[in-house]
Amino acid sequence: MAILSISSEFGTGALEIGRELRNYFGYEYIGIGRLLREAKEAAKQMNLFVAKGRQESIDSWGGNEFMSFMAMLHSVILEHAAKDNVILLTRGSNYLVKGIPHALGIRIVAPLDYRIERFMKKEGVNRETARLLVKQADREIDCALHIAYGKGLDDPEAYEIKFDTGTQKQEEIVEIVKNLLESKDALKTPEAQKLIQMRALVARIKAKVVINPGFYSTTLEMEIKGDGILLRGVVSGKAEQKEIEKEAREIARSVPLICDLDCQSTRKKKS
C-alpha cells in the first residue's frame, strides 16, 4: 500500500481527517506525540547527549543538541514510512518522503479566525486565549521547520496537494485523498520500496553519527549513490574519523559505504 504524510497548520482539523483515513484504509496512524516519545526513547538508548561526558538533557533544544535530536526524529519517521500502510501527521515528514513514488504528501490549512473558533470550541477557552495559543503554535512550528529544513510552513515543494478546511468539508477532503492514495498504491514497486528503505538507513546512520562529540554535526552530508551511501563531513581528528567510520559501517552492514571525512587536526598541520 502507500504512505500518507500530512502537514498542517495548528487547529485545522487535520487530526480528524487522518483518523478517518486510518479507519478506511486500516493504516497505522502516527502523530507527532508518538514520534517525539519514540525519538526520545531511542536517544536515551543510544546515550544521546551523555556520550563522552556530555551531560545535557534531551529536553534542552539548543544548538547541536537540537540538530542531534532532529536527526533521531527523522530516523524514527523514516523507519515508520519504510513499513508502508502508514499515515504520518507530523511537521517535516513531507520533506522526508518527497520523491518516493508511493508516498503522498498533503498540506491542510485554514484561515486564522476559523482555527481560533475551532480551538475555542474544542478547549473551552475565550477568543483572546485561543488567538494567542494558535499564533504561538504557528510560530514554534515555523521556527522548527526553518531550523531543521531551511523551509517555512507553507513551502509548496513539500506537498502535492493543498486543502483548506475553512472552505472544504472534511468529507470532501477525505474522498479526494482516498482516490489519490489508491492511485499511489499502484506506484509501489521493488525499486520504490528500496529507495525508502535506503533513506531510512541513511537517517539511522546519521542519527548514530551525530551523537559523537568529535563530529561537527552541522557539516554532515549523506546521500544515496547508486546502491550505496556517501558520507561526508568534518571530524576533529583521526581517532574520531575511525570511530565514526566503524559505527557507520556497522549500521550499513552489506550496503556499500564511502566515507569522505576531513580531519581538522590534519588541516591545521598542513596550514
Report residues per predicted region:
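Residue-level preference for the first positions of well-ordered beta-strands
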Residues: 1-5, 85-87, 228
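Hydrophobic/aromatic beta-strand patches that form the interior of the parallel beta-sheet core
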Residues: 4, 30, 87, 104-106, ...
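Glycine-rich phosphate-binding P-loop
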Residues: 4-21
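A short beta-strand-loop structural module common to alpha/beta enzyme folds
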Residues: 27-37
